[in-house]
């Protein structure tokens, strides 16, 4: 991914966040993007797309919010008859087609997944992920809290560590996995979850990583460092994950 590709991806993400926040859509960082915020205060350095998940009930509100971004950004929605790969994609109008086969969207994009809910849990509506256990108690997710992501703050699950370790054991800090999907070409590099895994500590002097210290009042100080060089420090206040 080139520097200009990354800038375009981040500007698309920033536009999406601003639009969804303004429309009061319930959404939060998801998948590798949440891992990126927790571990790097931004994208995973070797990732090539960004992900959010939003309330299935907010689809109409989201369409109205994101349509305001046209003509600078375009929203792809799969056909209503489609029963899998249900996520939407937001991409810049200045992005160029690069996939090996013609696609109705362009890279870099932001993937928009959906969750449904009952009184106690939420779950990813995509069958593949639901079957893989992407189901969480509301007490893990709500109330949402804002987390750093580059130069913006974005909603995240209340207990983001428990949320991640439900489906990505070791993802918070200890293990770093190579990507298994090439989003630029829209094709798998490796089977899902079959990437090379190394201890993240092997990369501490190469990429920025977040380190945490808890204070006496229950706050958590997050320091973003490369080796011994501190890039930024953020204080995260204590929060009660009530499920509401």
Pin down the residues of each PLM region:
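The feature captures the alpha-helical scaffold/lid subdomain characteristic of nucleotidyltransferase
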Residues: 1-26, 36-46, 54-244
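A short acidic/basic microdomain associated with nuclease active sites
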Residues: 29
